[in-house]
């Protein structure tokens, strides 16, 4: 068996970078005012390859990349190949809000590792994959000042601060197999883990009043399963139609939450509340299930188009009543609901095997998406939506199917009818490297 040490070294290096990223604390890996609700912003699953096509992937079959959006897609590969995928992402955001007090504007940018996945064959038409990706991100920092003259006259200036950080990661192990050369099925075991910190402070300029600090630290963990299938039908010598579907089970989250509240004056602190709530099998917090369907049409390795739809039900999540998933002092009523996503994308490669012009070997992609979040605000049920366009290119490197994907995601998040809600404009840059090598080939001697 021939093993490429360079590919193995790059894969190991990427693995330790991911481990280091999941252990970081004290810095935001993501930032959004809307991440104050629930367990934060749900991370869009997929590699740089699928993200550059609007986030599709349920019906994608490409032997050159690892498509971990659908467990059944792991079977689309060379039967003797080892594959790895490593990605990073940078979010650049501008926030706008119009209220009775005026117009407000701010900006933020963050950097995070988006995925690390390994895949290799098991036997004949079956294959295995293992990886880690973010599931949700929390990152926000609010500051406001008391404006009531009666309160200011009694206590002096009062500052309210709220900030949060952390998130949930998902580690997954999956396998798939192909039957009758057309039907592929796959299954995945998912382990959720992560820490979310949410803090609220009230600070008085009058030292005769004690500052109030309160917050929640949640350690979450849980397991679930995901299933997928793909059916590929040839429509001609090069043309093929693929139907795909995925389903992720809902799950009760375990772990614990530390709830605290204390008052400080100078260097002295008095603990007012400190307790630990155990979440194990309590049903207090529950991640919603998710159903996805997709259809794609492709012509060999020249072009492909795809449309996906996803629906996730979070109405029984328990976030509405559990304090640790809210921010103290928030004026908005948070309610879990059903999230939906519509995604469409295309890929075009002029000539993958061209030996004269490098740019003809480059793959060009684009896509559109509309995402409705898993929560709404206020009794009237104001939805939070995201809409955007994506662009991307994959540049072949080294030899074989190795490539580097660079993509952009331009979009807006918020309520498109209500300008009093924060409008989040973003330009996301993502870079992914897919490594491909033949490991399970016997050397022949003459």
Protein language model regions, located:
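Bacterial N-terminal signal peptides that target proteins for export
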Residues: 1-9
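Bacterial N-terminal signal peptides
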Residues: 9-18
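Short hydrophobic "helix-edge" motifs at membrane interfaces and signal-peptide entry regions
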Residues: 10, 59-61, 171
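N-terminal, post-signal peptide beta-strand-biased segments of exported outer-membrane/organellar beta-barrel
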Residues: 21-136
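Outer-membrane beta-barrel porins/channels
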Residues: 24-52, 121-446
């Amino acid at each position: 068996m021939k093993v490429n040490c360079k590919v193995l070294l790059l894969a190991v290096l990427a693995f330790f970078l991911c481990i280091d990223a999941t252990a970081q604390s004290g810095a935001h890996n993501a930032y959004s005012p809307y991440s104050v609700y629930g367990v934060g912003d749900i991370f869009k699953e997929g590699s740089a390859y699928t993200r550059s096509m609007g986030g599709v992937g349920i019906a994608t079959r490409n032997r050159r990349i690892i498509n971990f959006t659908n467990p059944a897609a792991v079977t689309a590969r060379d039967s003797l190949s080892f594959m790895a995928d490593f990605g990073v992402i940078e979010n650049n955001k501008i926030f706008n809000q119009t209220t009775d007090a005026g117009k407000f504007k701010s900006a933020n940018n963050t950097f995070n590792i988006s995925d690390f996945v390994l895949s290799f064959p098991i036997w004949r038409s079956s294959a295995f994959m293992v990886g880690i990706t973010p599931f949700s991100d929390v990152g926000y920092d609010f500051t406001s000042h008391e404006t009531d003259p009666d309160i200011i006259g009694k206590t002096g200036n009062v500052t309210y601060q709220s900030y949060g950080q952390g998130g949930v990661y998902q580690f997954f192990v999956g396998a798939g197999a192909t039957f009758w050369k057309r039907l592929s099925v796959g299954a995945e075991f998912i382990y959720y883990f992560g820490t979310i910190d949410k803090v609220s402070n009230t600070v008085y300029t009058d030292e005769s009043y004690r500052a109030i600090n309160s917050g929640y630290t949640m350690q979450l963990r849980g397991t679930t399963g995901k299933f997928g299938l793909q059916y590929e039908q040839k429509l001609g010598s090069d043309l093929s139609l693929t139907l795909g579907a995925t389903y992720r089970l809902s799950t009760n989250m375990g772990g614990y939450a530390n709830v605290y509240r204390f008052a400080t004056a100078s260097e002295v602190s008095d603990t007012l509340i400190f307790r630990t709530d155990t979440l194990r099998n309590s049903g207090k917090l529950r991640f919603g299930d998710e159903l996805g369907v997709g259809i794609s049409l492709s012509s060999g390795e020249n072009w492909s188009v795809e449309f996906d739809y996803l629906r996730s039900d979070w109405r029984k999540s328990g976030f509405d009543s559990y304090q640790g998933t809210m921010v103290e002092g928030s004026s908005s009523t948070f309610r879990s609901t059903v999230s939906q996503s519509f995604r469409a994308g295309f890929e075009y490669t002029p000539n993958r095997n061209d030996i004269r012009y490098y740019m003809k070997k480059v793959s060009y992609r684009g896509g559109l998406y509309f995402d409705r979040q898993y929560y709404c605000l206020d009794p009237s049920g104001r939805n939070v939506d995201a809409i955007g366009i994506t662009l991307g290119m994959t540049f072949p490197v080294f030899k074989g199917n190795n490539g580097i994907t660079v993509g952009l995601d331009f979009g807006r998040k918020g309520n498109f009818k209500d300008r009093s809600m924060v409008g989040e404009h973003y330009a996301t840059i993502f870079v992914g490297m897919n490594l491909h090598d033949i490991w399970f080939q016997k050397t022949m001697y003459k």
